[in-house]
């Protein structure tokens, strides 16, 4: 890949790519004695994404804070855990304090030092993104962030990727999406963006199409791959 064709903007997904939604299992165990924190955290995340899909397909947009709250109610009920209103509010607030993956901050620092424009592109509502980046410490290594909220649709709808490019005032060819989510990779690819899939689980790619993409196991590896492209 030549310097004239190499994407100069790296747009990072937030949840699961830079910060770990499943790491809140330990806090769930502490706050809900007798509950299975990891099971709740996993189902919570699964339903959060599912509800965002439903809302987009049905054209009944509610923001990601709402999807997060609704998903927690279901996950707790499915795991036979009863939540008081106070517990529900406290648990929902955990999404404002998600832990970054260990490789996130070092990779962002190195990529920014190498001259890349770094942004977060997330389903999160503006307050969720801002709080998460501030509390995780990752915000200082980013140039900006973009929420899907203004277009009232969630990933992987085509409109959200067009919104990303327009908000950045960039050419499609200059933007590469970095995400651990196969649906996000599918959506970005369909919209004409370059992609890099972060395969943290080590499993197969669960995409709708067989298409070329950069696959890495960590953000450290992504940094190394991009360094090699620059040679």
Predicted regions and their residues:
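Active-site neighborhood of HAD-like aspartate-dependent phosphohydrolases
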Residues: 2-46
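Asp-based, Mg2+/Mn2+-dependent phosphohydrolase catalytic module
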Residues: 2-9, 109, 121, 125-126, ...
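Hydrophobic side chains within well-formed alpha-helices
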Residues: 24, 40, 87, 138-141
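Hydrophobic alpha-helical core bundles mediating ligand binding, dimerization, or RNAP-core interactions
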Residues: 25-28, 44-48, 68, 91-95, ...
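Alpha-helical elements of Rossmann-like donor-binding domains used by nucleotide-donor carbohydrate transfer enzymes
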Residues: 27, 43, 70-74, 90, ...
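Short helix-capping segments at alpha-helix termini
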Residues: 32-37, 78-83, 113, 137-141, ...
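A metal-dependent, Asp-based hydrolase signature
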Residues: 38, 52-89
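Short, acidic loop-to-helix structural element flanking the phosphoryl-transfer center
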Residues: 65-66, 83-120, 130, 158
